[in-house]
A protein has these predicted regions:
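Extended, compositionally biased non-globular segments
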Residues: 273-334, 342-348, 354-362, 366-370, ...
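Terminal catalytic/cofactor-binding subdomain
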Residues: 1-137, 142-144, 159-162, 176, ...
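Hydrophobic faces of well-ordered beta-strands that scaffold small-molecule active sites
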Residues: 1, 62, 146-150, 335, ...
Length: 484
């Protein structure tokens, strides 16, 4: 969620927000605890959600706890998401701030002073910037996605991943919301997704950029997927000394001689240095390192998982050699897995949309990306046939077209119409209303990016141009459109 000053529209790092958020939740009788980092509160944990920060104090994120699916599942998730949004908007008032309905702030600095001021002090960033040479500050202007997570059986994991990757152009076009950067039109409807070549292009290891490029072909199974991710030519990220899931904050070790993860796992031990104190250590390869490294790619979708029981590393490596071997092993180990969709830009109901499309469409904005992905994965065989019909390589080209032109491109619009048809067929009738926003965008040809550009161009030459966006494009409290 892109935080903006409620009077000027400027990018605005939060200060008192988390204390205020705890108070808002406690006043409703919700138990919560603060999440601390370097003696500063960077999040609030409740049973229903994790409310925290992405890479900067100017970019909030909320991750809801998993909910049971089935008929009405999206409505239940939508009610929770709107409750969390309401809490966020109320707490932001303490900082004189609001959420701007954009997937990237329209005019935010990215210089060294701003980066030092607003970047969250996570240990992982020392490795990414200081060792790997990422231009991490490219994303410090609050680039935001509406990440959607849908559980899938492990036997269908690779198929589901291929579906979401292959059909990403439709989600990019439907939920495009970042046409502006540094106070100027970028020529893209979804400029947010230009981030990866800019972050990785100057990086120390060419393999980092490889893991953000649309794959040359679909993945045959999970073994194929992880061979692609951990292959020679890539370089392992730093690895934990013990098994834990807070990968952005855990002490880790940078391996000497920069091996790929595949080479490290086949060695009994590897020398390296701790990222927190520089101490030389030996790291013994373990199945936890395979599980930990799942976040190492930056495509439009990831397979995310946890294993109830970690297998012995030799057993994992043996299973990895055989087609379907990881799927079978993970099932035995009690896998809990889902597809993380990363293509949709962040979007919220604002006054512009409410005035144009009405309350039913406004209420569906938060859930529409989830409805598209859930519908496709519930109808995965038809969705995979759609990928085959359109051709994998051609779909990769359309992804770039969707970033630039959105639904103005006839091919992207035709693909999107077919994607929504397949998704609709995969949803229970009770959840079909969650596609209302996606339907509206397709039928009108106007995404949030188009609506934002109309307002922006209409106030050209005004010194307070950012402030003039707020009446139409600040996220509305759900009370305004019947979301609560």
């Amino acid at each position: 969620m892109v935080v903006a000053h409620a009077q000027t529209g400027a990018s605005h790092p939060v200060h008192a927000y988390f204390d205020a958020l705890r108070q808002v939740k406690q006043d409703r009788g919700v138990a919560c605890r603060p999440v601390m980092l370097s003696d500063r509160c960077v999040g609030v944990h409740t049973q229903a959600a994790e409310c925290g920060l992405d890479n900067g104090f100017n970019l909030l994120e909320t991750a809801t706890a998993p909910l049971d699916g089935g008929p009405g599942g999206l409505a239940r998730l939508g009610a929770l998401a709107h409750r969390e949004l309401a809490d966020t908007l109320e707490a932001l008032q303490v900082d004189g701030a609001c959420v701007l309905n954009v997937a990237q702030h329209p005019d935010c600095p990215r210089d060294a002073d701003w980066y030092a001021r607003v970047c969250v002090p996570r240990p992982i960033y020392r490795e990414l910037v200081g060792y790997r040479g990422w231009h991490h500050w490219i994303g410090i202007d609050a680039k935001a996605q509406n990440g959607v997570n849908v559980a899938v059986p492990v036997a269908r994991a690779a198929l589901s991943l291929n579906v979401v990757l292959g059909l990403a152009a439709a989600s990019i076009a439907l939920f495009a919301n970042s046409p502006l950067e540094s106070g100027k039109s970028t020529g893209f409807k979804e400029n947010r997704l230009t981030i990866w070549p800019r972050v990785f292009g100057p990086a120390r290891f060419a393999g980092d950029a490889l893991l953000a490029k649309y794959p040359a072909r679909p993945f045959r199974d999970l073994g194929d997927y992880f061979r692609w991710m951990f292959q020679p030519g890539t370089v392992s990220r730093s690895l934990p000394l013990d098994h834990r899931y807070d990968y952005k904050s855990a002490p880790t070790v940078i391996l000497d001689r920069d091996p790929c993860l595949m080479d490290f796992l086949h060695a009994s031990a590897w020398p390296g240095r701790r990222t927190d104190n520089g101490q030389a250590v030996q790291v013994s390869a373990h199945a936890m390192h395979f599980e930990h490294s799942q976040i190492g790619q930056f495509l439009d979708a990831r397979w995310r998982y946890r294993l109830e029981t970690l297998p012995p590393l030799p057993v994992l490596l043996q299973a990895w050699k055989h087609e379907g071997g990881l799927e079978a092993l993970f099932a035995e180990c009690g896998v809990d897995g889902y597809i993380e969709g990363r293509a949709p830009g962040a979007g919220f109901a604002d006054a512009c949309l409410l005035g144009e499309a009405g309350g039913d469409v406004a209420r569906s904005v938060l859930m529409a990306p989830m409805a598209v992905q859930l519908g496709l994965l519930n109808n995965a065989d038809a969705a995979w046939q759609l990928v085959r019909d359109w051709d994998w390589e051609r779909l990769g080209e359309l992804r770039l077209t969707a970033m630039r032109d959105g639904l103005a491109d006839a091919r992207v619009r035709a693909l999107t119409a077919e994607v929504l048809s397949v998704a609709q067929a995969g949803l229970p009738e009770a959840d079909a209303p969650c596609l209302a926003y996606a339907r509206y965008v397709l039928e009108s040809g106007r995404s949030a990016a188009d609506r934002l550009l109309d307002t922006w161009n209409g106030v050209s030459g005004c010194e307070d141009r950012l402030a003039r966006l707020l009446p139409q494009h600040a996220a509305l409290h759900p009370d305004r459109f019947g979301g609560l």
